């Protein structure tokens, strides 16, 4: 890991004013986008990040490093060209091909291509649409080896409330008021256009990752007996099957990465955690919407298992060595070189904040997981208490690497 040391003890409240001040002091171009009645995001040209949403100009709902609290610390982080600057980002996968020089020495050979992250981004704006474009020069370390040029364009724009057209009793909130009015909302869509040029049959896919604050529970909308693959240390009892999908505790203290087989998932992942004073019984919910295509050749693989692939969604949990965050990850449409047609994917990011029971009802609409289950998780129930443990019946037998006792090198996912 490079750059300033991150204190993993707990999250630091970093509000809208602090984020914009740090970016401005570092000379980083950014744009503020209104994504709800009282919610905004900040699109940064450094690393092509989306920070927020920020409700009522308060703290960011996704994870940001402590360096955002101080101009000097943030300047040092940027000067180091480190990738770990928080927020929502797009990388190009498979990681095993473009970031791992030697899959037999995964952590020892991890290397982030600097043209990918932080990269050089051109930032533009038309109305409420912000565009970021960059060219990444990549080297493939798996067969076929060689150089790959990736042209990546992102368009970030507001997303309408996903529940706005619901009718009937199920759409009602407290006292019969519409559920859409019972919770705060901030949402945006990231359109990702990916084109590659290479001299061989190189695989590539856009890869959307949001760094979220740990301490909550992820819900993957999925079929029963979902195929789940361990990439690092086994997830174990932090995962359980629940009605409507799979629940996973993201602690920020237990390193693991898991993948979900494309035929078994809808493409939606939710993440709920408590916010504020426990006595107020409030929660925040993040739902990522993407397209999971069972016919697509999703090419990410665990390092010890060549040929084990086909996962369209991933979850990552840090052990504290990189800041104690977690990541919600979704894959875009795979392309195959040498010169395929460019593809465009759309990733939705819907955020809701309010009373726990209301937020849980929103989750039921979007994920198919019962509201009572989501509310229990938001109030601190572990996955094993929400449903039967899925560690033995759901996870594959894919081997996991030996735990690494040393501080992690840069690269998490």
Predicted regions and their residues:
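Surface-exposed acidic/polar loop and edge beta-strand patches at domain peripheries
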Residues: 2, 6-189, 193, 197-247, ...
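Long, low-complexity, intrinsically disordered segments
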Residues: 396-413
